[in-house]
Amino acid sequence: MSGCGCGSSCNCGDSCKCNKRSSGLSYSEMETKETKETVVLGFGPAKIHFDGAEMSVASKEEGCKCGDKCTCDPCNC
């Protein structure tokens, strides 16, 4: 999964601060060239890995995703 701490301290990973609900659950749609998947997180550790596939991740509310070199792309915290 992708996560961003927006601004000059952008970071990718589980510490994403964008679009966090108070329940700790998050909703994401993941697209590759061949498939589209919906992922609901918060019930256990998220470990998603695609080999050799281009992937984009965006939350339901157009939050943030990490782009090249750990940039927030886009980020609406």
Swiss-Prot record:
- State the similarity comment: Belongs to the metallothionein superfamily. Type 15 family.
Q: Any signal peptide, and if so, which residues?
A: none
On whether Transcription is a keyword of this UniProt record, the answer is no
Alphabetically ordered keywords of this record: Metal-binding, Metal-thiolate cluster
Instruction: Tell me where on the tree of life, at the top rank, the source sits.
Output: Eukaryota
Its protein name is Metallothionein-like protein 1A
What the protein does comes down to: Metallothioneins have a high content of cysteine residues that bind various heavy metals.
Q: Which PANTHER family match?
A: METALLOTHIONEIN-LIKE PROTEIN (PTHR33543:SF10), METALLOTHIONEIN-LIKE PROTEIN 2A (PTHR33543)
Q: What is the lineage of its organism?
A: Eukaryota, Viridiplantae, Streptophyta, Embryophyta, Tracheophyta
* Single Gene Ontology MF annotation: metal ion binding
InterPro entries the UniProt entry points to: Metalthion_15p
